[in-house]
A protein has these predicted regions:
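N-terminal cap/lid segment of alpha/beta-hydrolase-fold proteins
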Residues: 31-77
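Accessory cap/linker subdomain of secreted extracellular hydrolases
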Residues: 35, 87-149, 214-313
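A fold-wide structural signal in alpha/beta-hydrolase
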Residues: 58, 81-84, 148-155
Length: 313
């Protein structure tokens, strides 16, 4: 990964100019070739639920995907790494990845998702996401095996307070942004990393990658965010001037429910994380006030920095 490539597809449909490729387009050609080429490595090796300890002691959980030989042994070569930090639990990404590996199932599912159109309904904002599926959206949301089998490592991390990670969900806030920088630094220092990190993701994971780039961590060399946003009212709640109140409650409910799904493997192994449970019970339905704030706060940053005061101001 070289240079800084930013492809922004915003929810409003307005394209944001990408940063020019300093190689004159050579990097884009190389990226496409790597993503679309036949697999260079026959297998993918996965390290499940690898702990990453943040500076405040909170432990986040990550799955690490690396190219492997026919026996399933990961290659020894240090590789560029693609990072995705998600609030939707790695378990969902694993499920999507597994479905895509079933012969004869992936294509019909992708076609169905791409055909969904919620225009004119309270769920209008979802349409942009479903239409991105046909262009490789699921690989960006979950695991991109094409990249892994062609010489990249991929790290998928449960954001603080979601999935199997400890802590309280700090939606796109200062602590979560600091976590992103620390995860990037941790990734760059692993033996399987060549020290260069890129980020990709859709929607929430697109926004946190843009935020991470703004912090300019030394190891972050590129981001590819699909469907990020900044103004919740214009991008989600009132897209095009039509008020749609269905998405935000559904989204908050989804994340708040998914964060209670436990790590079954750790339970079976007698290694259940009791702090994880304590953190969930302490904040069972976080960010309900932010749902109301979405109608008045100018930007996502306002809600993240001033979650309980933006309406009053």
């Amino acid at each position: 990964i070289s240079g800084v490539l930013v492809a922004l597809l915003v929810a409003s449909g307005t394209a944001v100019p990408a940063t020019a490729d300093p190689t004159g387009g050579a990097d884009a050609v190389a990226w496409t070739a790597a993503a679309d080429a036949p697999p260079q490595y026959p297998q993918v090796a996965i390290d499940w639920d690898v702990p990453i300890t943040m500076s405040d002691g909170t432990v986040l959980q990550a799955n690490i995907y690396r190219p492997a030989d026919a026996s399933g042994r990961p290659v020894e070569t240090a590789l560029p790494t693609v990072l995705n930090i998600t609030p939707y639990t790695k378990l969902v990404g694993n499920l999507i990845d597994s479905i895509q590996q079933i012969p004869g199932v992936s294509e019909p599912v992708l076609d169905f998702l791409a055909s969904l159109n919620f225009a004119g309904t309270p769920f209008d904002g979802i349409t942009d996401l479903t239409q991105a599926v046909d262009g490789g959206g699921l690989r960006i949301f979950a695991v991109n095996r094409n990249l892994v089998q062609n010489g990249y490592a991929q790290v998928v991390v449960d954001a603080r307070g979601t999935g199997f990670s400890q802590g309280t969900w700090d939606v796109l806030g200062p602590r979560e942004q600091q976590d992103s920088a620390e995860i990037i630094d941790w990734t760059s220092r692993q033996s399987w990393s060549d020290g260069t990190v890129g980020m990709s993701g859709i929607s929430y994971s697109a926004i946190n990658s843009v935020q991470a780039a703004a912090l300019r961590p030394p190891a972050l060399k590129a981001i590819f965010p699909v469907e990020p946003g900044n103004d919740l009212l214009r991008d989600i709640v009132g897209t095009g001037g039509a008020l749609g109140v269905g998405f935000m409650p559904l989204w908050l409910t989804l994340v708040n429910v998914l964060k209670f799904v436990p790590n079954v493997q750790s339970i079976l192994q007698g290694q259940f994380d009791t702090r994880w449970l304590a953190d969930r019970l302490a904040d069972p339905a976080i960010l309900i006030p932010e749902l109301a704030n979405a109608f008045t706060a100018p930007t996502i940053a306002d809600i993240a920095l001033y979650p309980y005061t933006s309406m009053a101001e």
